[in-house]
């Protein structure tokens, strides 16, 4: 019997690449996104498309019901849909802050609620939650985004213990800098929100760093391969840091005090070459 996987945010980047790999592995894959017109290549590859907005409860219920009626099972849920809108905390409207939580946390949690009854019935399943190294550290202008990713980490750790007796694994994926449309969207929002406020100078420096980091990031396929490894492993790790210098950055973070890491982050924004970490490793 073919295993069934549901992937959110499948219209681009990590979600799209993971869908392709799982089809090649013999999975029945449902790819969900708001923009199904961007998934025609996935449909041709054998992915079944679902129009889903993770902030729309009725749409999520409908899609899960449709999938379960057709397949009778769900083996993997990849909570990949995400949204990043940067700006100084003082400048970001509360409506925008709430929307980030709706997409990155509440949508993830609700979709998980919807698939869990079937997974418990099967007494097996795997939930893969896309976090970020941003769930382990902060940076200027990212207060709301990082808050959502810290929440993903805490939610996943608690859920893992709740589901152990049912044979359901919960795995956290922590990507570093990845070349996707996400960075461009976050950069654009940051400049629009704080580029001409009291935080303007730091904002412009940060935006320039985003542009450099995007060029040095890993391709989405790097993270997708890690996700497939987590899905297919007999006993997966509880979390995987992957791509875009993720392991190095988290290692450096573990060595430094909070104030030392703050200084490192702020100094990185002044760098103009690829030696950001070498030049900035220790405070001067």
Label each residue range with its predicted role.
Residues 66-79, 85:
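A glycine-rich helix->loop->beta "capping" turn
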Residues 112, 148-151:
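Active-site helix of classical SDR
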Residues 88-89, 96-98:
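Substrate-binding pocket helix/loop in short-chain dehydrogenase/reductase
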Residues 165-214:
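C-terminal beta-strand-loop-alpha-helix "lid" module of Rossmann-like NAD(P)-dependent dehydrogenases
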Residues 11-12:
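Conserved glycine-rich cofactor-binding loop
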Residues 132:
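Residue(s) in the substrate-gating loop at a strand-loop-helix junction
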Residues 52-62, 94-95:
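The beta1-alpha1 cofactor-binding region of Rossmann-like NAD(H)/NADP(H)-dependent oxidoreductases
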């Amino acid at each position: 019997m073919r295993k069934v996987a549901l992937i959110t945010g499948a219209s681009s980047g990590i979600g799209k690449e993971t869908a392709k790999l799982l089809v090649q592995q013999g999975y029945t894959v449902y790819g969900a996104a708001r923009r199904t017109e961007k998934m025609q290549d996935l449909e041709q590859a054998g992915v079944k498309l679902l129009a889903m907005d993770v902030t729309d409860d009725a749409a999520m219920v409908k899609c899960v019901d449709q999938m379960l009626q057709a397949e009778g099972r769900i083996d993997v849920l990849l909570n990949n849909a995400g949204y990043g809108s940067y700006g100084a905390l003082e400048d970001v409207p509360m409506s925008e802050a709430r929307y980030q939580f709706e997409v990155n946390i509440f949508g993830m949690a609700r979709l998980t609620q919807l698939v869990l009854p079937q997974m418990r019935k099967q007494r097996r399943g795997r939930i893969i939650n896309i976090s970020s190294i941003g769930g382990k550290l902060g940076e200027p202008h990212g207060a709301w985004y990082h808050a959502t990713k810290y929440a993903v980490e805490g939610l996943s750790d608690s859920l893992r213990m709740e589901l152990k007796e049912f044979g359901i694994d919960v795995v956290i994926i922590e990507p570093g800098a990845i070349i996707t449309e996400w960075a461009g969207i976050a950069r654009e929002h940051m400049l629009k929100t704080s580029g001409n406020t009291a935080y303007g100078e730091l904002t412009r420096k940060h935006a320039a760093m985003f542009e450099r980091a995007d060029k040095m990031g890993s391709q989405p396929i790097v993270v997708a391969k890690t996700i497939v490894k987590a899905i297919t492993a007999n006993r997966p790790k509880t979390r995987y840091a992957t791509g875009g210098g993720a392991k190095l950055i988290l290692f450096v973070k573990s060595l430094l005090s909070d104030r030392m890491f703050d200084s490192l982050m702020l100094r990185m924004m002044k760098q103009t070459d690829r030696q950001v970490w070498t030049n900035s490793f220790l405070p001067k």
